[in-house]
Amino acid sequence: ENNVCFMIAQVLRFWPEYELIKELYDSGKYGKLLSGYMGRLGSYPAWSWDNWMMDEKRSGLVPYDLHIHDLDFLVYAFGKPEASLKHRAKQPNQDYLTAVYEFPGFFVTTEASWYASAYPFGASYRFQFEDALVTYEKGECKIYENNGSIYSPTEQATGDTGSINLPKSDAYAEEIKYFKNCVLSGQFPDRVKAEELRTVVGLLNEF
């Protein structure tokens, strides 16, 4: 409408360990996806200006601060959920939510929280494919194959070994680089599609 190039930043779409899940799902390398888990847990943010983060009208609290990232990735990687079951406990000592999203042939359980105690922030996932379990915990990605092999994808991996290459990169820098290249080339940044974001916001508003 205004003839400008814009992109809403959703950094997990550029995060190597998360991109890996989409690649494995699309390629079928380890068979069909059977189930998944994504979590994003931490404590109440005390660092924001003017207590901005604790003002629901401005920040949206846990659904929009934390859960939005995992939900956006799910919609990006697997499409719009067929159904969902959501629970939220918004109390003085916690803002905690959990949701199960159903997709054709599998479901993903998610959780996100702000706790009143000084619980350290952490993001994690587990995705169970037919032939392997892929995890991301404490900043490390591991693949547990059904044949007993366990390994961490690394930037040193090469195609001729059959292992998976994870580029060592800064997801935020890759996101900015992608948008910059779209602006310079005159291409619309369709890696972050408006219809996917509308789906995400619609689901978040149900909490």
Question: Which residue stretches match the model-derived regions?
Answer:
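NAD(P)-dinucleotide binding in Rossmann-like oxidoreductases
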Residues: 89-94, 103-175, 190
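Hydrophobic residues in well-ordered beta-strands that form the structural core
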Residues: 6-8, 136
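C-terminal helix-rich "cap/oligomerization" subdomain common to oxidoreductases
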Residues: 1, 27, 104, 164, ...
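Short beta-strand scaffold segments in enzyme catalytic cores
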Residues: 99-101
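Conserved loop-to-helix N-cap of the C-terminal "lid" that shapes the substrate pocket in Rossmann-like
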Residues: 64-67, 169, 191-197
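Structured helix-beta-strand junction loops
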Residues: 1-3, 80, 104, 130
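Predominantly a Rossmann-like dinucleotide-binding segment in NAD(P)-dependent oxidoreductases
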Residues: 4-5, 12-87
